[in-house]
From Swiss-Prot:
Natural killer cells. Immune inhibitory receptor involved in self-nonself discrimination. In complex with KLRD1 on cytotoxic and regulatory lymphocyte subsets, recognizes non-classical major histocompatibility (MHC) class Ib molecule MHC-E loaded with self-peptides derived from the signal sequence of classical MHC class Ia molecules. Enables cytotoxic cells to monitor the expression of MHC class I molecules in healthy cells and to tolerate self. The modification Phosphotyrosine is found at Y8, Y40. Residues 94-233 are extracellular. It is found in: Cell membrane. This is NKG2-A/NKG2-B type II integral membrane protein. The keyword Glycoprotein applies. Heterodimer with KLRD1; disulfide-linked. KLRD1-KLRC1 heterodimer interacts with peptide-bound MHC-E-B2M heterotrimeric complex. Competes with KLRC2 for its interaction with MHC-E. Interacts (via ITIM) with INPP5D/SHIP-1 and INPPL1/SHIP-2 (via SH2 domain). GO terms for biological process: adaptive immune response; CD8-positive, gamma-delta intraepithelial T cell differentiation; innate immune response; negative regulation of natural killer cell mediated cytotoxicity; negative regulation of T cell mediated cytotoxicity; positive regulation of natural killer cell mediated cytotoxicity; stimulatory C-type lectin receptor signaling pathway. It holds the Pfam family Lectin_C. SUPFAM superfamilies: C-type lectin-like (SSF56436). The keyword Cell membrane applies.
Length: 233
């Protein structure tokens, strides 16, 4: 028991004064480490500043180099727009001119075919003549009498220009041309020889003439067809 008590007292001895005197050395070492860390931090800051300046110069150079590329892209864009405009011009303008020409021709014919004060309202006028646009169908002889009752004559054709006008506004009609037989010439109701070509059919009894969109044709006089009348001013 006494031996154990001695050991216990030895373990509870106060600290060695020499060990306490060694603490300032530890503080000096800490100060040195702190100075080294500060120096290292300053070096890192200088390096970071240099890297930032270098990156700024590099980005500035990139901006300077991208300017010509932007210029080239702009020029290419303008060229594309010019090419597109040229294509549109080549395609659109000819069709527009053609349409204007057709409209001009139609307007000219329409102006010539306006209602005239000398003609009834249901009639149209063209080149000093009034035209009745019929809707009912009659034989050639009946059509001739119907036009006479309207103080006019069955549709007649005086020249090529008039025939073009009539084929533009009419689908078909009897005209004042007939013949006695297939062995006789075509004549008008005034007894004048008809100068325009009439396309013959295979039927010998087709001795009356009709106006169609595709030209003049012979037809059977007894068949019912649409007729139109003409009155010269």
């Amino acid at each position: 028991m006494d031996n154990q008590g001695v050991i216990y007292s030895d373990l509870n001895l106060p600290p060695n004064p020499k060990r306490q005197q060694q603490k300032p050395k530890g503080n000096t070492s800490s100060i040195l480490v702190t100075e080294q860390e500060i120096t290292y931090a300053e070096l890192n800051l200088q390096k970071t500043s240099q890297d930032f300046q270098g990156n700024d110069k590099t980005n500035h150079c990139k901006d300077l180099l991208s300017a010509p590329e932007k210029l080239i892209a702009g020029i290419l864009g303008i060229i594309c727009l010019v090419l597109m405009a040229s294509v549109v011009t080549i395609v659109v303008i000819p069709s527009t001119l053609t349409q204007k020409h057709n409209n001009s021709s139609l307007n000219t014919r329409t102006q010539k075919a306006r209602h005239c004060g000398h003609c009834p309202e249901e009639w149209i006028t063209y080149s000093n003549s009034c035209y009745y646009i019929g809707k009912e169908k009659r034989t050639w002889a009946e059509s001739l009498l119907a036009c006479t009752s309207k103080n006019s004559s069955l549709l007649s054709i005086d020249n090529e220009e008039e025939m073009k006008f009539l084929t533009a506004i009419l689908t078909s009609s009897w005209i004042d041309v007939f013949r006695d037989s297939s062995h006789h010439p075509w004549v008008t109701i005034n007894g004048l020889t008809f100068k325009h070509e009439i396309k013959e059919s295979d039927h010998a009894e087709h001795n009356c003439a009709m106006l169609h969109v595709r030209g003049l044709f012979s037809d059977e006089c007894g068949s019912s067809k649409i007729y139109h009348c003409k009155h010269k001013l």
